Amino acid sequence: MPSFPRTVMLLGSGELGKEVAIAAQRLGCRVIACDRYAGAPAMQVADVAEVLPMTDADALLEVVRRHQPDVVIPEIEALAVHALAELEQEGITVIPTARATAVTMNRDRIRDLAAGELNLRTARFAYASSAEELKAVAEPLGWPVVVKPVMSSSGKGQSVVDCADDLPKAWEAAMAGARGTSTQVIVEEFLHFDLEITLLTIRQRNGETLFCAPIGHEQEGGDYQCSWQPAQLTDQQLHQAQAMAKTVTDNLGGAGLFGVEFFLCDDEVIFSELSPRPHDTGLVTLISQNLSEFELHLRAVLGLPIPAITAADAAASRVILAQTNMDSVAFEGVEQALTEADTQVLLFGKPTARPGRRMGVALARGVDRKEAQAKADRAAACVSVIPGSTAG
């Protein structure tokens, strides 16, 4: 009998899922990759690929029951999450838990948990279910405010609003970017923060919680552009962030890696969001740590030891984005991007492109953050996404 689960099913097969699949296969696991479109990145390295509408509960239940995996690892947010609870009741392990997946895919549920039940410090916020209600709740928060759909991903539908006249446009953007049938937004005070960080938090099956060195990152339109590790925090800030991350992940339960996001404002640490899975800003750990966030996730999921997490003095990442729509893709400039030492380029293998779609990432190590970020930026700037051949 195997000493740990051997069949892993990924619900979502993007670039993060691809790295999870690679980490799983290096541990001898069989990987089944599921997504809504064929040829998704993780499918390219999986043992089995399944294409299905991921928000269709019946389709999701059918594919899981047919394969009977040892563990199901959700890797995206656009899922029929209520089906996961049904699978858990049937004895299938959902990572970290079905409840954690459901709570964190809804900004209102995770915010109510963090601010209300767990009493974590967050930005002041309110909810609105119409353009008229949005105007009523935004004014007391003061300008500017941030408007987001309660259900969306990768910054879709988010906007910063400077005055009441711009709220109707923000409402329309939120509805256009919302996932599923949600018609509610969360509106938050705009925080003039010093730094935005991700604290990768690992819950092990033995009950122990581990932390990676904090990762600083910059976003544009709610989508990650670059990250670096370690981010510079005071001892007090780090202690606050770790305490809050442990509080919320203990409540969500299960085993695995969580990406817990915080704002740093002066000396205050403010909870932002949480993903119960490897985080895009954590791609930097592929070059910065002895164990990447993907390897850590798999070790925690499978109940394997994590003796130590060590990191380089400084490492950084910069995304590689598409500029136009393309039915097939290729890349130019990779050879120039790889001329510097301690630099890597990852091209995700997405079959098509659209403006702003993340197609790859450049990673670099340096003696300090400035050097590492400059190297990653130079490498990313070398790479262009171009139309590929459509020949079969």
UniProtKB/Swiss-Prot annotation:
Gene Ontology CC: one annotated term: cytosol
Domain of life: Bacteria
Protein name per the record: Formate-dependent phosphoribosylglycinamide formyltransferase
HAMAP family: PurT
Binding site for ATP: R107, K148, S153, S154, G155, K156, G157, Q158, E188, E189, F190, L191, E196
UniProt key word Magnesium: yes
Binding site for N(1)-(5-phospho-beta-D-ribosyl)glycinamide: E15, L16, E75, D280, K350, R357, R358
The species this protein was found in: Synechococcus sp. (strain CC9605)
Keywords assigned by UniProt, alphabetized: ATP-binding, Ligase, Magnesium, Metal-binding, Nucleotide-binding, Purine biosynthesis
Annotated GO MF terms: ATP binding; magnesium ion binding; phosphoribosylglycinamide formyltransferase 2 activity; phosphoribosylglycinamide formyltransferase activity
GO BP terms: 'de novo' IMP biosynthetic process
Function: Involved in the de novo purine biosynthesis. Catalyzes the transfer of formate to 5-phospho-ribosyl-glycinamide (GAR), producing 5-phospho-ribosyl-N-formylglycinamide (FGAR). Formate is provided by PurU via hydrolysis of 10-formyl-tetrahydrofolate.
